[in-house]
C-alpha cells in the first residue's frame, strides 16, 4: 500500500513522525481523511480536536490537538498544533478533574474535552 510521510508537531515538541497510510483530522471545514496522493490542502484545526494516524505498520496513533494547521501535499502531511498530547500520555482522571474545576475557563474546558475524546478514539 502507498505511504506518506507524516509529522505531528506541537509548539513545544514533535510528538510523532513517520510513514502512514491514513490521517484523519477535525478542521474548521469538517473532518478530513488524507491518504497518499491526496490533493494539496491547508486546513485549520479545530480547538479541542482529535487527529488519528494509521501508520505504515497498521498501528493507530491518536492525539488530542488544540488549534493549529494541517498541511497536505501528495507525499506529506504536516500537523502543526498549538498544543497536542498523544492519547497514550493523557491522564483521563486529571482531564475530568479539570472539567469539574474549570468554572468559566472555556479554553481549559475545551482542552480537557479534547483529551478525553482522544483517549476514547484511541
From Swiss-Prot:
Major subcellular location class: membrane
Pfam family, one: ATP-synt_DE_N
Topological category with respect to the lipid bilayer: Peripheral membrane protein
Keyword Cell membrane on entry: yes
Keywords: ATP synthesis, Cell membrane, CF(1), Hydrogen ion transport, Ion transport, Membrane, Transport
GO molecular-function term, one example from the UniProt record: ATP binding
Superkingdom of origin: Bacteria
GO terms for cellular component: plasma membrane; proton-transporting ATP synthase complex
InterPro entries: ATP_synth_F1_dsu/esu (IPR001469), ATP_synth_F1_dsu/esu_N (IPR020546), ATPsynth_dsu/esu_N (IPR036771)
Compartments, record wording: Cell membrane
Membership in a protein family: Belongs to the ATPase epsilon chain family.
Cited function: Produces ATP from ADP in the presence of a proton gradient across the membrane.
Subunit note: F-type ATPases have 2 components, CF(1) - the catalytic core - and CF(0) - the membrane proton channel. CF(1) has five subunits: alpha(3), beta(3), gamma(1), delta(1), epsilon(1). CF(0) has three main subunits: a, b and c.
Full protein name: ATP synthase epsilon chain
Species: Rhodococcus jostii (strain RHA1)
Amino acid at each position: 500500500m502507498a505511504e506518506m510521510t507524516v509529522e505531528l508537531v506541537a509548539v513545544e515538541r514533535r510528538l510523532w513522525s513517520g510513514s502512514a497510510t491514513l490521517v484523519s483530522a477535525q478542521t474548521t471545514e469538517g473532518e478530513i481523511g488524507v491518504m497518499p496522493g491526496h490533493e494539496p490542502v491547508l486546513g485549520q484545526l479545530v480547538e479541542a480536536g482529535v487527529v488519528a494516524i494509521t501508520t505504515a505498520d497498521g498501528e493507530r496513533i491518536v492525539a488530542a490537538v488544540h488549534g493549529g494547521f494541517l498541511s497536505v501535499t501528495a507525499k506529506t502531511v504536516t500537523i502543526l498544533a498549538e498544543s497536542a498530547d498523544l492519547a497514550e500520555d493523557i491522564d483521563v482522571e486529571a482531564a475530568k478533574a479539570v472539567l469539574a474545576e474549570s468554572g468559566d475557563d472555556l479554553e481549559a474546558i475545551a482542552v480537557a474535552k479534547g483529551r478525553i475524546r482522544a483517549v476514547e478514539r484511541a
